[in-house]
Curated annotation (Swiss-Prot):
EC number: 7.-.-.-
Enzymatic class: translocase
Residues annotated as domain 4Fe-4S ferredoxin-type: 381-410, 420-449
Pfam families: Complex1_51K, Fer4_7, RnfC_N
UniProt superkingdom: Bacteria
Stated name of the protein: Ion-translocating oxidoreductase complex subunit C
Gene Ontology cellular component list: plasma membrane
InterPro entries in alphabetical order: 4Fe4S_Fe-S-bd, 4Fe4S_Fe_S_CS, Ion_transpt_RnfC/RsxC, Nuo51_FMN-bd, Nuo51_FMN-bd_sf, RnfC_N
Single GO MF descriptor: 4 iron, 4 sulfur cluster binding
Function: Part of a membrane-bound complex that couples electron transfer with translocation of ions across the membrane.
Cofactor note: Binds 2 [4Fe-4S] clusters per subunit.
Record-linked PANTHER family: ION-TRANSLOCATING OXIDOREDUCTASE COMPLEX SUBUNIT C (PTHR43034:SF2)
GO biological-process terms attached to the record: electron transport chain
Amino acid sequence: MYKFIKYISIYIKKLFFLNISFFKKVISIFQVDNILFLKKSSQELLKLSRVTLPKKFFVLINSEVLNRGKLCVRKGDLVLRGQTLTLGCGNIVSIHSPTSGRIIDVINNYIFFLDQFFAVVIVESDGRDLWISRTPICNYTQFSSKKLINLIYHSGILGLSGSGFSTSKKLQCAVGKVHTLVVNAVESEPCVTSDDCLIQNFSKEIIDGCKILIWILKIKKILIVVSEEKIIAFNVLKKSVINLKDFELLKVKNKYPSGSSKKLIQILFNKEIPQGKHAIDLGIIMYNVATVFAIKKAILDGEPLTERVITLYGDKFLPSKNVLVRIGTPISHLMKIYKLNEKTLKVNIGGPITGLLIRNFNFSVLKTNNCIMFVSIQNNELNNFEEKNCIRCAACSYSCPMNLLPEQLYWYSKHSNHEKTQIYNIQDCIECGICEQVCPSDIPLMSYYRREKKQISIAKFKNYQIKKFKNLFLLRKQRLNNLNSRKKNTIVSQYIALNKFNFKV
């Protein structure tokens, strides 16, 4: 039955978008109960609850930070909430302790589905949840943009919509170059309502975060974009910006993947970001609404990023919930709170389309996680298919909202042909997952693309290092040659002077 729906979805998707609302109607006709494309409660008042603290936190840290000696704690150290565990390193932001307690251990671990090594700092909670001394900034207009950006950097804030790019780095590149700020509150992926809940509960704080960004970037136009289905969130924001001239509130259709930054810019401004360029080159900067909220907390409250709002969804056995959870909370703790059986469930980190399936329940909540789905093992049809050979049906090409050729990218990514994948613009892939959903051969296309992107970035970094050290070597060689030539000239001049003296004598 699901196979038949997959073929129907090819015709549902036309050129640019996958119409989720129509797709859900098709699913309801065929009565597929265990499909993951589920209805959002976008017209309901979303409540926000706080998750109780676990006994142990598992805070994941990029292994590059350890290699550069940026770790600030050792085994046995006592820490407070908000205390720096690791210093920032290039585009990698600082990591802070999610609670007060003691460092039990620091271990290296390979995260299989992320295909990367991480250091895990294990923090044992003392139950008191004591903060470090915080220094809120009430009048941020007395500070320069550079100082505020530096504070955001040390507060550990990054893109909370999934990109994970350093917020401060993005701000540094944008100062003096952009004229419009876009606050992205479009959650087009089914089941994910964390941003919707954040707006309904913290609209004033979000507006304050926008004002901070206006001061840093020195811009006069700000667009807050909301999906047309989020009626309550739109009305709440409308009341908050009613007397603010620089703010404009817009609605967009709930068509996946309209929440993607590249696609949203195309919808709002009818512009496409050129190959190898960024939105900043068009005079536009975009931030997720959760990132804006985190900026407000960092500047006005003096709180680094130690928690975030995520959506928990488990279909029949767990109604949709939005919870405020600490970074580093193990998923096993969430399952224990809501009495979910680990033996009968799988965990999907992220939404139903772009999420990653994991099997280790000790995996912890990351800063970039906005949704955790609990999927029944018996009814999980989406992950029970085996990968088969590509039949070149071109369903993925018809479905791609970025007008790429996923079929060609698949072949070249599979054989690690980096030159060809770059020619076919793999960097423009927004990883929406539509091509994977419509593929009749059940090929995990996103896995191939993510791995290829990572290999390309590693290769580029290696080439950069080679060129850098080659230039340093050439400069050193030039300095030595200059030094030798100066020595020779000195010896020759001394010899000539000595001969002249002897001749006079």
